[in-house]
């Protein structure tokens, strides 16, 4: 998985609240509806006040970083990370959802022509927003951005040591990349990964909570790491002009 300081979009979010002894986030006062997974006995999906479906990402341990030496030096060394369970939006935040935020709060206007040129409908992902724009939206919906570790863990979907977030090679039937469409695609156009997260590869960049530290992988704590050492925020994933190796 690559990380960049190139900025384009709004990201998936996680609810802000405490956790129980199992690391599961308490969300009763922050959602409209809870769907119980009968096997796990835990809320597998939740529906937030902004209408976003959120999937439960189980706690676990994974190897974070570039296993194939195809990315940036800052993606080394590969190291073991342990994360608590959390919920993540199943889709990228849409133009319609962000428009609702602006209308409700009077937040500063954006360059809508530039946005609609590549994301033309309310069901397309929101683009051309800064990290501060995403943080303002997150505060409004009582969520937060995922850390880089949370994002990578969720994006991998439980596929340890694989090149892509899907089984097999990347293909135009699985993701919007390499300008094969010419603009963003509506959220949910392609199949999800095994954690039920859509468009986790391709389509648009996604912001992370961390600040950028090129040496952080060498000093990262094992449990729930977050980099806070610099002024640049992290963006995971890229836009539709990504080459296949960027979608790792």
Question: Where do the PLM segments sit?
Answer:
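Positively charged n-region of N-terminal signal peptides that target proteins for export
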Residues: 1-4
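Bacterial N-terminal signal peptides
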Residues: 7-15
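A short glycine-rich, aromatic-capped structural motif
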Residues: 46-110, 129-132, 201-202, 209
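Bacterial signal peptide processing site
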Residues: 20-22
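A generic structural signal for short, non-catalytic loop/turn and secondary-structure boundary residues
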Residues: 9, 47-50, 55, 74, ...
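Functional-site microenvironments in short loops/helix caps that host divalent-cation chemistry
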Residues: 63, 67-69, 108, 114-248
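Short glycine/threonine/proline-enriched tight-turn/helix- or strand-capping micro-motif at secondary-structure
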Residues: 37-44, 78, 184-189
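N-terminal low-complexity, Pro/Thr/Ser-rich intrinsically disordered segments
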Residues: 27-47
């Amino acid at each position: 998985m690559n990380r960049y300081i190139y900025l384009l979009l709004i990201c998936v979010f996680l609810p802000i609240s405490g956790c129980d002894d199992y690391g599961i986030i308490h969300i009763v006062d922050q959602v409209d509806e809870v769907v119980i997974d009968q096997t796990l006995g835990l809320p597998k999906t939740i529906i937030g006040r902004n209408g976003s479906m959120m999937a439960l990402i189980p706690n676990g341990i994974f190897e974070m970083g570039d296993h194939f030496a195809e990315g940036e030096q800052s993606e080394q060394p590969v190291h073991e990370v342990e994360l608590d369970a959390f919920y993540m939006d199943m889709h990228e935040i849409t133009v319609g959802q962000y428009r609702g935020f602006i209308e409700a709060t009077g937040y500063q206007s954006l360059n809508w022509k530039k946005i609609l040129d590549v994301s033309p409908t309310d069901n397309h992902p929101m683009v051309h927003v800064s990290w501060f724009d995403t943080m303002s939206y997150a505060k409004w919906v009582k969520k937060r951005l995922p850390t880089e570790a949370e994002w990578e863990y969720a994006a991998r979907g439980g596929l340890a040591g694989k090149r892509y977030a899907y089984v097999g090679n990347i293909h135009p039937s699985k993701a919007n990349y390499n300008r094969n469409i010419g603009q963003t695609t509506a959220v949910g156009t392609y199949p999800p990964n095994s954690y039920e997260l859509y468009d986790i590869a391709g389509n648009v960049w996604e912001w992370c909570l961390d600040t950028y530290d090129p040496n952080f992988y060498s000093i990262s704590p094992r449990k729930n790491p977050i980099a806070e050492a610099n002024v640049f925020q992290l963006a995971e994933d890229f836009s539709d002009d990504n080459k296949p190796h960027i979608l790792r």
